[in-house]
Amino acid sequence: MKLDLVKRTFNYAVVNKPSGMVCDASHTNNIITALTNEFTKILPSVNSSQFRLVQRLDRFVTGGLVVARNKKWADKVRKSFFQEGTLRLTRRYVGLIALDQIPESTQGTIDFPIQALEKDYRGKNKSRELFTYSAVTHYKLIPSARRTIKGVFPVFQQGPILPIILELETGRKNQIRDHIIQKFGVPLLNDDNFSDFKLNSEIPKDVNSKLYKSNQIALHSGLVIMENNGISQQFLFPVNNAYDRELW
């Protein structure tokens, strides 16, 4: 499983993550180890301790994210999530949902509150507290790209598949996955068990393998726009892994 290094600077790295890689250094097959391996091919002296996760993608979600290389830049990214400082990050995703009918309104804002367990998997044997968070997601459905897919897996037999573009205003845990269900009454493609496992203390090994050959979810971080001190950079991320492209 390969992590694509899109850009590297003294302050940050931009990467394209495959499905199955974890954004948590305490787990095996994690993004920090993979990023360190890529860097050491160019800079052998690089140590994994310099990398700081300021964005996270769920294990079975693909696409781009920014990783800070020092505390100053990490703080800068975190401030941007609260509209503070000089840095602005725009994060856009593309997802797939199965909808029999196209809603009258094909774009808008989802602002339902979401519930999530406290962010600490190290205490698996201890019940974690449940919190309610405010959350805001902007969306746009693409009716012209709606298709009925003839695939061998049950995940393609749930109805016509409709692409949706999503932009985060807040960055809560599982925000997009939660908001899709609340807004449309259906999950993202191959995310049918989300409502069951999101409040479990342990991370499940198998999420939706009965519907598809892997646990990959039809959600991809496709675009990151970074604006810093008047300079704007856009990073467009394809689904690079051929194995991951089959769901799309």
Curated annotation (Swiss-Prot):
<dbReference type="InterPro" id="IPR050188">
    <property type="entry name" value="RluA_PseudoU_synthase"/>
</dbReference>
<dbReference type="GO" id="GO:0009982">
    <property type="term" value="F:pseudouridine synthase activity"/>
</dbReference>
<dbReference type="GO" id="GO:0160143">
    <property type="term" value="F:21S rRNA pseudouridine(2819) synthase activity"/>
</dbReference>
<dbReference type="GO" id="GO:0003723">
    <property type="term" value="F:RNA binding"/>
</dbReference>
<dbReference type="GO" id="GO:0000455">
    <property type="term" value="P:enzyme-directed rRNA pseudouridine synthesis"/>
</dbReference>
<keyword id="KW-0496">Mitochondrion</keyword>
<dbReference type="InterPro" id="IPR006224">
    <property type="entry name" value="PsdUridine_synth_RluA-like_CS"/>
</dbReference>
<feature type="active site">
    <location>
        <position position="58"/>
    </location>
</feature>
<keyword id="KW-0698">rRNA processing</keyword>
<comment type="function">
    <text>Pseudouridylate synthase responsible for the pseudouridine-2819 formation in mitochondrial 21S rRNA. May modulate the efficiency or the fidelity of the mitochondrial translation machinery.</text>
</comment>
<dbReference type="InterPro" id="IPR006145">
    <property type="entry name" value="PsdUridine_synth_RsuA/RluA"/>
</dbReference>
<dbReference type="InterPro" id="IPR020103">
    <property type="entry name" value="PsdUridine_synth_cat_dom_sf"/>
</dbReference>
<comment type="similarity">
    <text>Belongs to the pseudouridine synthase RluA family.</text>
</comment>
<dbReference type="GO" id="GO:0005739">
    <property type="term" value="C:mitochondrion"/>
</dbReference>
<dbReference type="Pfam" id="PF00849">
    <property type="entry name" value="PseudoU_synth_2"/>
</dbReference>
<protein>
    <recommendedName>
        <fullName>21S rRNA pseudouridine(2819) synthase</fullName>
        <ecNumber>5.4.99.43</ecNumber>
    </recommendedName>
</protein>
<keyword id="KW-0413">Isomerase</keyword>
